[in-house]
Amino acid sequence: MAAHCQVTGAEPGFGHSISHSHRRNKRRFDPNIQKKRYWVPSLRRNVTLQVSARGIKTIDVRGIDAVVASILARGVKL
């Protein structure tokens, strides 16, 4: 599963994990991606989205219809 949020566009970040002795190792910071299924009244069907925790909060505030409309406007197939 790709670590990419369909709502916010959050992607993995890269950096270092630093030990107590300050030795650095490359690591990847993944967003908190969840697979969520929503009922979309305007489409009259369920839509499964890969969303981050922040994306879930965005859907709660803006509403699923507005979020799905913006995703479809970008040309993403649901």
Swiss-Prot record:
Disordered: annotated span: 1-31
Any one GO MF annotation of this record: structural constituent of ribosome
Keyword annotations: Ribonucleoprotein, Ribosomal protein
Domain of life assignment: Bacteria
Cited Gene3D superfamilies: Ribosomal protein L28/L24
An annotated GO cellular component: ribosome
One BP term from GO: translation
A Pfam family of this chain: Ribosomal_L28
InterPro entries per record: Ribosomal_bL28 (IPR026569), Ribosomal_bL28/bL31-like_sf (IPR034704), Ribosomal_bL28_bact-type (IPR001383), Ribosomal_bL28_sf (IPR037147)
Family membership: Belongs to the bacterial ribosomal protein bL28 family.
Protein name: Large ribosomal subunit protein bL28
Species assigned in the record: Pseudarthrobacter chlorophenolicus (strain ATCC 700700 / DSM 12829 / CIP 107037 / JCM 12360 / KCTC 9906 / NCIMB 13794 / A6) (Arthrobacter chlorophenolicus)
